[in-house]
């Protein structure tokens, strides 16, 4: 570590693997002073000119705008765009933009009024009096994105490096052939470059600041050295010319000796890098309150009679600039935005200049040479030797052609900087960078689809969970409503129960006597006897239950069978007794309602039926007791006792049937004539007495 630090102190530089040395072709434009492009008749400002989503519009068609007025809202990583001049917004419509696909994007069309009037400006003479967040917000609202070609929002990048940045690198390499925008900017505005560096030092507080510049820019090196006189903490490093030494990872390796890990950025090792053009834009935004509305664009190529570098407003059509440089159309026409290795052919010359447009190359037909057809890969390995990122271009090519997305991703496809070195050395003329770009786009599309599917799944699961929660809550409310009664509901229930209780008490205790008739106690006596019979029946049931419990303790199965038979007989007789009692009560009630004499007859019949029911119950009880005693003495005696009990029970049933017939006959006779009723009652009493003697001869 000490040796590494000592080497840095002595201006030591390192080298990176790979790289190529193509013809530089820079003298066509680097020796010509910069010119200011006049305003065109129409400016076309795309809403998205950076890496990230487009901003929300703040203007409408037909509205007058001033120079530097925001056209969109900038939030987060959304960088706003501004009006390059004053004028009227004639349309907000899609237009072809500077992209290899040639797709149309939403743009604001402004017709300049020629006055070029600024909005109200608030310069900051001393930026050191402002806190870091105010400076970051100023840079963000100025719409500054990386002017080196990536277009990453500068404020977001700086905010991520507020803590932990050791080395600040200013990228002045500009390694790609033909491009000289940064070269001329450093030659003519070196003081602004140094001022912008001081603003970044105030923000990031790095331990050291390094400016990396290739040795093929002697005028720019001299201008920076003059601007750095008397400046401490800023070191100029001149590096050998090699493509692509201007790459972020490659220049980091050259100046610090550190390698950025795969899948990481230079900030992961404490390094933050900014382009020279971005530094000048930061100075103008912070101190002069000028948003990013213009940039330096290199116009070069043999198809131009007067190449050079121009200060061009954002939104200026490419064809307008080409005419300023003396464009001579070729057949077939070819205009490249960017350099010959990393640029792309424009689908139309009507596309506008954007924030990342650093060069417009218009080559002659003989300058670029004839395009040769693509041939099969011969596995020579030259692409591997030329790759500055340490990748395997040959394998990535096969993965891209075979649509093996995961393998391409695992082989660090996204670490490819698309420098074009592999395609430059390929003897088979395979456009490797095009395959890589297409594969990256497909992987990003698949990732976006997967993300949308995951979001849809999450929304569906959240909805299902919400419905389940609502269902449980609804069921709980229903249960609570069914169980918990309000005070009003409880009062209603109590009132209903009270009414039923009063009705029940009144039906049992009140006896209605028709008008004009004398009360007769015979029905009351009969009802009393019936209640006594019911009580005796309940007593019999209790005795039956006790007998059943006793018989469960008997070990012999035959004894258990006999006990069960006796229990069934007792239950049957108890039910018959209850039935007889009910009939007696009903008969008594009817008799009272019709005639006192009939009531007397009905009462007599009821008394007879009650007496017979009691005798039948007594017989059943005796039979059960006898059966129990016999069962306890001997199984054979138990069987005999059970047979005798069945016979007695049968006779009791016959006697009850006879009694019922007598009662019915008496009722019919009573209905015809009182004297016949008396005779029938006497006959019934005689028959009942005989039946009782037959049941119990003792």
Swiss-Prot record:
Its cofactor is [4Fe-4S] cluster. Binds 2 [4Fe-4S] clusters per subunit. [4Fe-4S] cluster 2 binds at residues 387, 416, 419, 422. It is an enzyme of class 7 (translocase). [4Fe-4S] cluster 1 binds at residues 377, 380, 383, 426. It is a peripheral membrane protein. SUPFAM superfamilies: alpha-helical ferredoxin (SSF46548), Nqo1 FMN-binding domain-like (SSF142019). The keyword Coiled coil does not apply. Its main location: membrane. InterPro entries: 4Fe4S_Fe-S-bd (IPR017896), 4Fe4S_Fe_S_CS (IPR017900), Ion_transpt_RnfC/RsxC (IPR010208), Nuo51_FMN-bd (IPR011538), Nuo51_FMN-bd_sf (IPR037225), RnfC_N (IPR026902), Soluble_ligand-bd (IPR019554). Keywords: 4Fe-4S, Cell inner membrane, Cell membrane, Electron transport, Iron, Iron-sulfur, Membrane, Metal-binding, Repeat, Translocase, Transport. It is found in: Cell inner membrane. The keyword Transport applies. One of its GO terms (molecular function) is electron transfer activity. Residues 366-397, 407-436 form the 4Fe-4S ferredoxin-type domain. Its EC number is 7.-.-.-. GO terms for biological process: electron transport chain. GO terms for cellular component: plasma membrane. The complex is composed of six subunits: RnfA, RnfB, RnfC, RnfD, RnfE and RnfG. PANTHER family: ION-TRANSLOCATING OXIDOREDUCTASE COMPLEX SUBUNIT C (PTHR43034:SF2). NCBIfam families: PRK05035.1, rnfC. Part of a membrane-bound complex that couples electron transfer with translocation of ions across the membrane. This is Ion-translocating oxidoreductase complex subunit C. It comes from Yersinia pseudotuberculosis serotype O:3 (strain YPIII).
């Amino acid at each position: 570590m000490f040796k590494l630090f000592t080497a840095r102190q002595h201006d030591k530089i390192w080298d990176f693997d790979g790289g190529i040395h193509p013809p530089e072709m820079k003298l066509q434009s680097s020796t010509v002073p910069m010119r200011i492009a006049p305003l065109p008749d129409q400016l076309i400002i795309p809403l998205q000119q950076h890496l990230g989503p487009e901003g929300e519009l703040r203007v409408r068609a037909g509205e007058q705008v001033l120079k530097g007025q925001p056209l969109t809202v900038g939030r987060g990583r959304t960088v706003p765009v501004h009006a390059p001049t004053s004028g009227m917004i004639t349309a907000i419509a899609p237009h072809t933009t500077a992209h290899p696909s040639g797709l149309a994007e939403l743009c604001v069309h402004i017709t300049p009024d020629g006055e070029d009037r600024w909005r109200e400006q608030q310069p900051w003479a001393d930026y050191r009096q402002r806190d870091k967040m105010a400076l970051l917000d100023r840079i963000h609202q100025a719409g500054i994105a990386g002017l080196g070609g990536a277009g990453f929002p500068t404020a977001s990048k700086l905010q991520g490096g507020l803590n932990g940045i050791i080395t600040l690198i200013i990228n002045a390499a500009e390694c790609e052939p033909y491009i000289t925008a940064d070269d001329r900017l450093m030659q003519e505005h070196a003081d602004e470059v140094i001022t912008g560096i001081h603003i970044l030092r105030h923000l990031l507080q790095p331990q050291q600041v390094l400016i990396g510049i290739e040795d093929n820019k002697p005028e720019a090196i001299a201008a920076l050295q003059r601007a750095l006189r008397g400046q401490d903490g800023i070191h100029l490093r001149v590096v050998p010319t090699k493509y692509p030494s201007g790459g972020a990872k490659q220049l980091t390796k050259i100046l610090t000796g550190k390698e950025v890990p795969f899948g990481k950025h230079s900030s992961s090792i404490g390094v933050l890098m900014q382009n020279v053009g971005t530094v000048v834009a930061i100075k103008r935004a912070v101190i002069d309150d000028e948003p990013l509305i213009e940039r330096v664009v290199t116009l070069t190529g043999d198809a131009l009679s007067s190449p050079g570098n121009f200060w061009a407003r954002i939104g200026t059509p490419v064809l307008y600039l080409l005419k300023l440089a003396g464009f001579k159309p070729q057949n077939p026409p070819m205009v490249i935005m960017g350099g010959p290795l990393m640029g792309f052919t424009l689908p139309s010359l009507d596309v506008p200049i954007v924030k990342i447009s650093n060069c417009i190359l218009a080559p002659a037909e003989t300058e670029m040479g004839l395009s040769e057809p693509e041939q099969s890969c011969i596995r020579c390995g030259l692409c591997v030797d030329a790759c500055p990122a340490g990748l395997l271009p040959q394998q990535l090519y096969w993965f891209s052609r075979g649509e093996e997305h995961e393998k391409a991703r695992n082989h660090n496809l996204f670490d490819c900087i698309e420098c074009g070195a592999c395609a430059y050395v390929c003897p088979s003329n395979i456009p490797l960078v095009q395959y890589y770009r297409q594969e990256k786009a497909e992987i990003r599309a698949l990732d976006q689809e997967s993300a949308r599917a995951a979001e849809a799944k999450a929304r569906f699961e959240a909805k299902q969970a919400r419905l389940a929660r609502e269902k449980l809550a609804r069921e709980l409310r229903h249960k609570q409503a069914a169980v918990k009664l309000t005070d009003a509901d409880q009062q209603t229930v109590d009132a209903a129960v009270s009414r039923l209780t009063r009705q029940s008490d009144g039906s049992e205790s009140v006896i209605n006597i028709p008008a004009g008739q004398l009360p007769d106690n015979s029905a009351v006596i009969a009802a009393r006897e019936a209640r006594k019979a019911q009580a005796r029946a309940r007593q019999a049931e209790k005795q039956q239950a006790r007998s059943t419990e006793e018989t469960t303790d008997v070990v012999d199965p035959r004894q258990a069978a006999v006990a069960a038979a006796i229990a069934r007989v007792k239950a049957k007789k108890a039910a018959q007794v209850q039935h007889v009692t009910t009939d007696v009560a009903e008969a008594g009630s009817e008799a009272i309602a019709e005639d006192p004499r009939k009531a007397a007859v009905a009462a007599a019949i009821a008394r007879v039926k009650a007496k017979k029911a009691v005798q039948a119950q007594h017989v059943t009880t005796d039979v059960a007791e006898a059966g129990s005693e016999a069962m306890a003495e001997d199984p054979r005696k138990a069987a005999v006792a059970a047979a005798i009990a069945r016979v007695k029970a049968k006779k009791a049933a016959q006697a009850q049937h006879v009694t019922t017939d007598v009662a019915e006959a008496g009722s019919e006779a009573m209905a015809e004539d009182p004297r016949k009723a008396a005779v029938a009652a006497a006959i019934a009493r005689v028959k009942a007495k005989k039946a009782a003697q037959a049941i119990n001869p003792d």
